[in-house]
Amino acid sequence: MSAPWIIAAALGLLLLVLVVGAFLMLAMGRLHLDLGWGRSVHQLGPITIGIEAPRKLVFEIVAAPYLGRASGSDIDLLAGDERLAVAAHHTKVHFYTARTVEVIELDPPGRVGFRHITGPVPHAVEEFTLSDLDGETELRYEGEIGIDFFVLGRLAGRHWVRPQWERGVRRHLDSVKRGAEERAASQERRSRAGGRRDSAAG
């Protein structure tokens, strides 16, 4: 193989490595591009689940990481107060972890909103709403993501980003449901035990 072909092959390989590396950096949220070129918007959800726990308790579990009240979480609280927070989310996606930084609006006990700052996509808005249903809770999620680069962005959003995103949301909702129902059941057991003690003392 002649020298020009060797150089061309080396440059082609280098370009491929750079493209793959840039894609991974974007997917991991380490490289943020907000160009607005050919942006397509993709709806997320709605996803709704029923939780056998009071709305106030469910809201406490959803909001806890953004109030500095959850240990061992994959969420880093960067700043905030009782109504507004900035946090970094670390989400496992196959062989890598995606990092997203968002502004979180806390409106107890009925709403938690998210507005994207940096991460794998240039635009994302999400919302959890909590409705009281006779002492239980309906937790509803919906939102949208925007992805640039025309047809490539539309294909990536439809076949990769949105399915992965919604899969992560469903895992989170399942975790909230499990935690809320366990806490509600524990509180109910303690309440019954206290009632029995009061009856025995009387």
Where in the sequence are the language-model features?
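Amphipathic, hydrophobic N-terminal targeting peptides for secretion and organelle import
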Residues: 1-9, 196-202
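Hydrophobic ligand-binding cavity/cleft-lining segments
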Residues: 3-83
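Beta-strand/loop substructures that line and gate deep hydrophobic ligand-binding cavities in soluble
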Residues: 3-5, 116-171, 176-178, 187
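Phosphate-binding glycine-rich loops and adjacent basic patches that engage nucleotide phosphates
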Residues: 17-26, 88-93, 129-142
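Phenylalanine-focused residue identity feature
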Residues: 23, 59, 95, 114, ...
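Short, flexible segments with low predicted structural confidence
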Residues: 28-32, 101-102, 141, 148
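General secondary-structure edge motif
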Residues: 38-39, 83, 110, 145, ...
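Glycine-rich portal/gate segments that line the openings of hydrophobic small-molecule binding cavities
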Residues: 42, 50-52, 63-125, 138, ...
